Swiss-Prot record, chain B:
Record's subunit section: Homooligomer. Interacts with RAB11A, RAB11B, RAB25, RAB4A and RAB14.
PROSITE patterns associated with the record: C2, FIP_RBD
Any GO MF annotation of the entry: small GTPase binding
Domain C2 per the UniProt entry, residue ranges: 1-129
General function of this protein: A Rab11 effector protein involved in the endosomal recycling process. Also involved in controlling membrane trafficking along the phagocytic pathway and in phagocytosis. Interaction with RAB14 may function in the process of neurite formation.
Biased amino acid composition, Basic and acidic residues: 164-188, 381-394, 422-436, 445-454
Gene symbol of the encoding locus: Rab11fip1
Sequence segments annotated as region (Necessary for interaction with RAB4A and RAB11A, subcellular location and endosomal recycling): 584-648
Compartments where found: Recycling endosome; Cytoplasmic vesicle
TM regions (residue ranges): none
Main location: other
Residue stretches making up the FIP-RBD domain: 576-638
Descriptive protein name: Rab11 family-interacting protein 1
Region (Disordered): 164-470, 483-503, 516-555
Amino acid sequence: ATTPYNYSYIFKYIIIGDMGVGKSCLLHQFTEKKFMADCPHTIGVEFGTRIIEVSGQKIKLQIWDTAGQERFRAVTRSYYRGAAGALMVYDITRRSTYNHLSSWLTDARNLTNPNTVIILIGNKADLEAQRDVTYEEAKQFAEENGLLFLEASAKTGENVEDAFLEAAKKIYQNIQDGSLDLNAAESGVQHKPSAPQGGRLTSEPQPQREGCGC
Amino acid sequence: MSLAASAGRGPGTMWSPTHVQVTVLQARGLRAKGPGGTSDAYAVIQVGKEKYATSVSERSLGAPVWREEATFELPPLLSSGTAPAAAAATLQLTVLHRALLGLDKFLGRAEVDLRELHRDQSRRKKQWYTLKSKPGKKDKERGEIEVDIQFMRNNMTASMFDLSMKDKSRNPFGKLKDKIKGKNKDNTSDTASAIVPSTTPSVDSDDESFSKDKKKKSKIKTLFSKPSLQKTPLSQSMSVLPTSKPDKVLLRPGDFQSRWGDEGDNEDESSSASEVMSQKRTSSTDHTQPNQSNFSLPKKEGLSFLGGLRSKNDSLSRSNVCINGNHVYMEQPEAKSEIRESSPSNSPSPQGFRKRHLFSSTENLAARSPKEPGEGGGMSSDRRLSDSSTKDSMKSMSLPSYRPLTTADSREGLSPANMEVATKETKDSKKQESKKSSLLSLVTGKKDVAKGSEGEPLPPVSEKEKGRKGVLVEAQLREEDLVRRPEKDAVPVASQWGSSQNPFEDAQISDLEASVESKCEPKPPVPVPRTPQTRAVKPRPHPVKPMNTTAPKITNSSLGTATIISENLINEALMKKYQPSDPAFAYAQLTHDELIQLVLKQKETISKKEFQVRELEDYIDNLLVRVMEETPNILRVPAQTGKKAGKM
């Protein structure tokens, strides 16, 4: 942390899905490597960060978590805006959460930019006995809609890391092949050329807190 | 239809219907006035002066379904073939959106010329009518309303009681009413059918139910004397909006809430109705208006009866529910201001309280006799004041109902123990209860009115009412008012003094004050000692509703008293089951109707809360967006220990 930035990119992620599918737990598991057993349900908006490495590049993931998409319309718009990656989560033990995916997907498509990478996550994979949605059908749904797909468990940590990493890889790949224009206003990616005055500084949070441990 | 057809053709058809039964089936394509493209729609149906409202179809997406009926007596003119006044033979349909705050919103209106309809030979016609804008306003697409109109003879099936008709001569159609009245007395043809289930069940409805179920209220009974009417299922659901019940004040909490919000509606309505409406409207008006100031006023004096009621409420606030079935439905936001006023919390000795109530109740029963029943010894102070005031009040007060309400309020305000007493009383004097309830509603309405209705010019009404009242009121007053007034009058004074030795007295006083105020309001000119207090409230003469029914009621009242007493006994028996400390105690004494009212009130409260929550959410929403865009770091989850508890 001697340099202003110890990462090259900031990717903005969002997590969407029905209430109770484990969005916040996924975030917490990813950022803290812990499982919140009785996670209170999220009311407002918050985000967590973690730096990962993809192809030798340090990338800071800024993962936004929210609830109440129904009640906070303005927040929701702002929430989706400029997301480079979206984790669309359902609960494999509750079919209704799976059935709602198409509406979540519609929102994501409408409110994010075309290059936003969307990964479908079937959470609570540890509850195999209560499974209500098969892996196969979800996989098919993902393929039909051009989504990445993983089943994960925020409780055990299974595939949680991979979910975030897979999306990051895809985004980075899009950057490399030029399909994602970093200069686009809402790309959801900030490039930090190792200098504080990096290119497009939008309103993204500054990374100065990195390593401060608070 | 077949009948009509067979009867023959031409305006002077063979059969002449005496009644017309109007069933409001549904509407569609209504404009959305509520959140989410919905409306809380209800329809007001009116023929001549008679007016009924349907229940509120909540959250209807432009297509509410009511299926509620009302039966109107047709002007003889129609049947005889002579040309009846157009207004008297026109069915007016008005669809409104019940607004949580402010005036109800106009959704559309339609008029049906019953003469023409009848000329068409059809005995029954179900048809969609296009809803139009108020006269003079540009037409919009307002949807349509489906109504089933059925002409009948000898309407024995009237589902609803017409409370409104009896006594008002105010309306332009007074003549018609007179005729009707005559009929009612003789035949007991209650043409009424009101439907006003909306927000808060109307007092009237309660009365009806009572009469049906318990027949407690003598006065009411007279109105509903016909058994057939009582049977009708709809009756409960409908309440007469503009009613002028003989004894009771017509105002209902629901009314206040602005069912009638639209100005246009008022215009259409008959004068009597309009008065009522105005009151209601006023009540519905915004809190922000000056009238509210009264509420906020810490001083009891400044407060009108409303304030008094509130004060009572405050003491009782924990149990909003009232005694006797006169629950006070506390009005939510305003309560705070009331609290200040509220007399020091009394732990009233239930017993003493009871006695009092009993006296009052008995008195009420005896009310017919003009004499003022001396209240319990505790009341002495009140009496002093009361004497002078009573006279004035008598003159001024056209509406006996207010008083009862006030008393009811006081009771309500009292502790649960008081409740018991109150219940007894209520039972005894169902009339009173109804009045009380009406009073309550009035009070609440007044509050609202005062708040919202600054702009409305009501003062003239009061004077008019006085004149009317003078005649009509006397009879009523004698019965009920006389008994209570002394108390009330005295009470107000005491309240002014500010310290009542007896907690009960305080409560009563507050009630009395309220009543006095209410009285004063309608009749500002009357010089009452308390006038200064009342004046603040005065602006709203509405509280005084046109209670025209006098004579018929009296007769009934006598009968009613006996029944009431028995009921009281029954109620007492029932009440004993609950300990005063039991939260259920307050509710145990409520009648079914009261409970319904309570539920409706609660629902209203909840919807208001929801609205507030919504506002807060919107605020947070916007705030969050700003944070997200400008200082998102604030939203960052703390790295180490998350805000969230429960980590493993």
